[in-house]
A protein has these predicted regions:
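An acidic/histidine-cluster motif and surrounding catalytic segment
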Residues: 1-49, 53-129
Length: 129
């Protein structure tokens, strides 16, 4: 019942989505509720991680401070920085964003359903909510 109320408030129509299971809807809503809280608190961006995410080599370079993020992305723009992969083949294109810590930031040009780790900006949160 709480889940249905939250879906009705934050993501109308999600409960009727035919291709998502109840568990998938609940998982998505855990993200949406966090985005709403971040928006309410005026946070410029938030890092989101699933409880079973495995951190890779040099993850601390991306998580210990945010200077690299602020140097590469305008906090007032809509962006999502994916910090994980499911080893799913995707199409990408160059973004023009400078590499950091041996990692590139290409634009995602195809679908990728993983949400185990990402950074989402305030404007992107507003877009999805």
């Amino acid at each position: 019942e709480r889940l249905e109320r939250a879906m009705a408030e934050l993501v109308p129509g999600l409960s009727a989505h035919p291709y998502l299971s109840g568990v998938e809807k609940a998982c998505f809503m855990s993200h949406a509720v966090l985005w709403k809280q971040a928006l309410d608190e005026g946070v410029p961006y938030v890092a989101v991680f699933e409880d079973d995410v495995l951190f890779g080599k040099d993850a601390e370079k991306f998580l210990a401070e945010d200077t690299w993020l602020e140097e590469r992305f305008d906090k007032d723009s809509a962006f999502i920085v994916r910090l994980e992969t499911m080893f799913m083949h995707v199409l990408t294109s160059p973004s023009g964003v400078a590499d950091y810590g041996g990692r590139a930031f290409p634009l995602l040009e195809s679908e990728h359903c993983g949400t185990a780790g990402y950074i989402i900006s305030r404007k992107a949160m507003r877009f999805f909510l």
